[in-house]
Amino acid sequence: MGSSEQELVAIVRELGCGPYFLGTFDKRFPGFMAPHKLACAIVNTAGRETGGVHWLALAWNPKNRTCYLFDPFGFSDERLKQIYQFEYEGLLKRSALASTPDHCITLIKSTQTVQGPFSAACGLFCCMFLHAFVNWPTSPMERNPTMDLLTGVPNSMLQSPQVVPTLRHNQERLYRFLAQRSPYFQRHCERIKKATAFDQMKNNM
């Protein structure tokens, strides 16, 4: 279940990200190739032929030559590779070669968990992050009115019953945020909530 590419594109555009949004991609995302343009994308950790596994958001700010990688689970590089066989070194290298004179960029990656371990709302959390990015491109991860609606917990506590109320509250705030800003989400609210439910992945086990 989870979010389809069509849903994510519709919601992202209604959040005002349209001029900067490159689209949804599978793990073969080519990177950011326009050197002077603010840009962002939603990228799956798997190939499109698999139907997809987990959504991440990537964003490029040319002013500070920084690439932001938002993972709602806040997994380390090693865990992303271990769990999803996903590596982003290649796309970072391609982005650096295309976007900066000295081929150097800064990577800022989310390290905290905002999504429950059995939630299928990763794509929707990515939409929320991209709203933060286009409005506050120098501090999209935190210290802005959008992402400050969520409470992050250490990734090491992802499976802890102690943080379940916090992560469930995050998902409720996510839905509320989208309902206030996306007519598409409003129209399809019931179906989207069912497909991205907090315990969706547990139900599929």
UniProtKB/Swiss-Prot annotation:
All late proteins expressed from the major late promoter are produced by alternative splicing and alternative polyadenylation of the same gene giving rise to non-overlapping ORFs. A leader sequence is present in the N-terminus of all these mRNAs and is recognized by the viral shutoff protein to provide expression although conventional translation via ribosome scanning from the cap has been shut off in the host cell. One of its GO terms (biological process) is proteolysis. Induction: Expressed in the late phase of the viral replicative cycle. Gene3D superfamilies: Adenoviral Proteinase, Chain A (3.40.395.10). Interacts with protease cofactor pVI-C; this interaction is necessary for protease activation. It comes from Human adenovirus F serotype 40 (HAdV-40). Cleaves viral precursor proteins (pTP, pIIIa, pVI, pVII, pVIII, and pX) inside newly assembled particles giving rise to mature virions. Protease complexed to its cofactor slides along the viral DNA to specifically locate and cleave the viral precursors. Mature virions have a weakened organization compared to the unmature virions, thereby facilitating subsequent uncoating. Without maturation, the particle lacks infectivity and is unable to uncoat. Late in adenovirus infection, in the cytoplasm, may participate in the cytoskeleton destruction. Cleaves host cell cytoskeletal keratins K7 and K18. GO terms for cellular component: host cell nucleus; virion component. The active site is at residues 54, 71, 122. It is found in: Virion; Host nucleus. The record marks 51-52 as: Cleavage. InterPro entries: Papain-like_cys_pep_sf (IPR038765), Peptidase_C5 (IPR000855). It is an enzyme of class 3 (hydrolase). Its main location: virion. It comes from the Viruses. This is Protease. Requires DNA and protease cofactor for maximal activation. Inside nascent virions, becomes partially activated by binding to the viral DNA, allowing it to cleave the cofactor that binds to the protease and fully activates it. Actin, like the viral protease cofactor, seems to act as a cofactor in the cleavage of cytokeratin 18 and of actin itself. Pfam families: Peptidase_C5. Belongs to the peptidase C5 family. SUPFAM superfamilies: Cysteine proteinases. One of its GO terms (molecular function) is cysteine-type endopeptidase activity. Its EC number is 3.4.22.39.
